[in-house]
A protein has these predicted regions:
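Serine-hydrolase catalytic machinery in alpha/beta-hydrolase-like enzymes
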Residues: 9-102
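Glycine-rich His-Gly loop
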Residues: 33-37, 109, 162
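Short alpha-helix in the alpha/beta-hydrolase fold that links the catalytic acid
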Residues: 46, 143-146, 155, 169-177
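Primarily recognizes the serine-hydrolase "nucleophile elbow" in alpha/beta-hydrolase
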Residues: 88-152
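Short beta-strand/loop motif that positions the catalytic acidic residue
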Residues: 153-154, 159-161, 165
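Acidic catalytic loop of the alpha/beta-hydrolase fold
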Residues: 163-168, 195
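Catalytic histidine-centered segment of alpha/beta-hydrolase-like enzymes
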Residues: 192-203
Length: 216
């Protein structure tokens, strides 16, 4: 069970909209969390991750991507992906202005994909990435890989993937991750589908991995 040890406040400045989780005892680290294509920053998984991070002293901004700010429902359009990454850049800059230490980017599905693409374009935008349920390919279309940017990704990446995720098998993800020149690790969530349920991710192990990378 996660105990609430943070002050949670709505944030809406500079085109960034979401919620700030402010820990009682800040570690100096910051994190931006973003949602998948069919969700928003109120997704239970993001709220749980934000609270888990706050228990470790991490200041968290879970935010709506620009496509979700424009409309409450519906998937993102491919033509708007660059704008979504620009929104992520602004969110990272916002959290960086609030903390003295490293900043992590984390996202579920589409949010994770855009986070990784932004890190490939701007290596200094984050100290490490947590990509949850990375959408390696559309379901039943394993040849339509979303990995063009992987060879440019030098930021450490933690993939958190369910073993029943139809967007990527463990074998497919392992093969794809080999193209990433930076440090990477796959953390499996046994029995979980693409929409990983609450309480299934080993938060302590996940954040320990991110911290291990920045300490090395």
């Amino acid at each position: 069970m996660l105990w609430f040890v943070a002050q949670i406040t709505e944030f809406n400045e500079g085109g960034v909209h979401g919620f700030l989780h402010l820990p009682d005892e800040p570690s100096g680290e910051g994190m931006v969390l973003t949602h998948g294509a069919g969700s928003n920053c109120a997704a239970p998984l993001l709220v749980e991750l934000a609270q888990a991070a706050c228990m470790l002293g991490i200041t968290v901004l879970r935010c709506d991507l620009p496509f979700r700010q424009r409309r409450a429902y519906g998937p993102p359009m491919p033509a708007g992906a660059a704008a979504d990454r620009a929104g992520l850049h602004n969110a990272a800059a916002t959290i960086r202005s609030m903390v003295r230490g490293p900043v992590f980017l984390g996202g579920h599905s589409y949010g994770g994909r855009q986070s990784s693409m932004l890190a490939a374009e701007e290596p200094g935008v984050a100290a490490a990435l947590m990509l949850i349920s990375y959408p390696l390919h559309p379901p039943a279309k394993p040849l339509e890989l979303r990995t063009e940017h992987f060879p440019a990704l030098r930021t450490p990446v933690l993939f958190v993937q369910g073993t029943r995720d139809k967007f990527a098998t463990h074998a497919e993800l392992t093969e794809a991750v080999a193209a990433i020149p930076g440090p990477s690790r796959i953390m499996l969530v046994e029995g979980a589908p693409h929409e990983i349920g609450r309480g299934l991710i080993d938060h302590a192990a996940a954040f320990a991995q991110l911290r291990q990378w920045i300490a090395s």
